[in-house]
Amino acid sequence: MSSNSLALKGRSDAYTQVDNFLHAYARGGDELVNGHPSYTVDQAAEQILREQASWQKAPGDSVLTLSYSFLTKPNDFFNTPWKYVSDIYSLGKFSAFSAQQQAQAKLSLQSWSDVTNIHFVDAGQGDQGDLTFGNFSSSVGGAAFAFLPDVPDALKGQSWYLINSSYSANVNPANGNYGRQTLTHEIGHTLGLSHPGDYNAGEGDPTYADATYAEDTRAYSVMSYWEEQNTGQDFKGAYSSAPLLDDIAAIQKLYGANLTTRTGDTVYGFNSNTERDFYSATSSSSKLVFSVWDAGGNDTLDFSGFSQNQKINLNEKALSDVGGLKGNVSIAAGVTVENAIGGSGSDLLIGNDVANVLKGGAGNDILYGGLGADQLWGGAGADTFVYGDIAESSAAAPDTLRDFVSGQDKIDLSGLDAFVNGGLVLQYVDAFAGKAGQAILSYDAASKAGSLAIDFSGDAHADFAINLIGQATQADIVV
């Protein structure tokens, strides 16, 4: 029996990195952020819906059906807007949506119907759609404007987009640019979503100081005016093309969650099978900005094509730092994503409460599976597998470290309360003898399988266990 023991050293840097990112972008509570109260996702959704405007489903229908069309000529509102809205005097010159605008508008509509129970039907050209689209040239309405569903029928469903010699962002909307973001934003208005705060383009000179709550930024809502940097994120010039975390929560409060969307095994990022441009990475320079809505299956965030150091968090309502951006990927409330794949940088991967598959890839990665019997691959490089609670790899449902390399990889137990606050000292033995803190390291050379088992309760049974493909030594265990 070995009598070697490892003395308490305090929480490691790897554990601290995990703990810090688990609490990064935290929301709610009583503290002010940037001088504003912090809202939870649910509070933000209620704020976005404060006007209580919505379309009504037909009696007995579980799905709202709305038609849409692209105007080919000015309608009555365009010709005499002052009859309907006193602060709009002239919209200038009308122009119909181009083929590019129409195609991108349809993608924006699709992104809304993916997350909620709305079915959009193409009514063709003209003004016969419930929702209509057109361009104007005067700057009186800002870059675009639209009407909530609580207005008179003469205005309901209309959205208008500025195109003139000094403003061209709406000419060529595309995934990740401001034109596509504008389409998704204005469609959100026509469906019942307001700005998160009481501001409008063309009404004074609003700034982030006018926000009602801290998370009123483009990191959380496509309906916001304010840059994501205000809340610590950075998209490096990219914009969301689809509803984000708070928008999804809001629209689902109005029309329900679409539980038919992506019910199979779905991959987001590289090797995406979503058939959605905003969920798909096509090169190492792709700038992803999205919030995952997924109704089932065994799903994966694949960021294997990026070389930057990434931080990936699989918990619902959490934000991740992906592809050199900060806080650019989130997971909507109620969504479970099972798996994550890192890139060639030194990544931090955080699992959730189900059985996750985490693959670090190249680089010196930190993997934290959380609860559930997780399958963890560190990949090439010196990797650290972090644990913060004995329940995260119980004897009944142990994690498996699939490619452990002794002398290079580490099993980090420094965050376990028994070591940090309980003063427990780890002692390696050949067999349990009823003393808390005893640990058994085993290895079978024929199968190349090893294990670590620890008795924390002193009942001569393992409370904590990890299976390994590879052999671990005492020097590989960090406490």
Swiss-Prot record:
Key words, A-Z: Calcium, Hydrolase, Metal-binding, Metalloprotease, Protease, Repeat, Secreted, Zinc, Zymogen
Cofactor list: Ca(2+); Zn(2+)
Signal peptide: none
Xref: SMART domains: ZnMc
Mutagenesis or variant effect for A460R: In strain: IFO 3455
Cofactor note: Binds 8 Ca(2+) ions per subunit.
Catalytic-site annotation from UniProt: E186
Gene Ontology, cellular component aspect: extracellular space
Binding-site positions, Ca(2+) 5: G361, G363, D365, G378, A380, D383
Residues where Ca(2+) 1 binds: R262, G264, T266, D294, G296, D299
Subcellular location: Secreted
Annotated InterPro entries: Hemolysin-typ_Ca-bd_CS, Hemolysn_Ca-bd, MetalloPept_cat_dom_sf, Pept_M10B, Peptidase_M10B_C, Peptidase_Metallo, Serralysin-like, Serralysin-like_metalloprot_C
E.C. code: 3.4.24.40
Annotated binding of Ca(2+) 3, by residue: G343, G345, D347, G360, A362, D365
Binding site for Ca(2+) 2: G297, D299, T336, E338
Catalytic activity field: Preferential cleavage of bonds with hydrophobic residues in P1'
Chain residues that bind Ca(2+) 4: N352, V354, N356, G369, L371, D374
Name used for this protein in its record: Serralysin
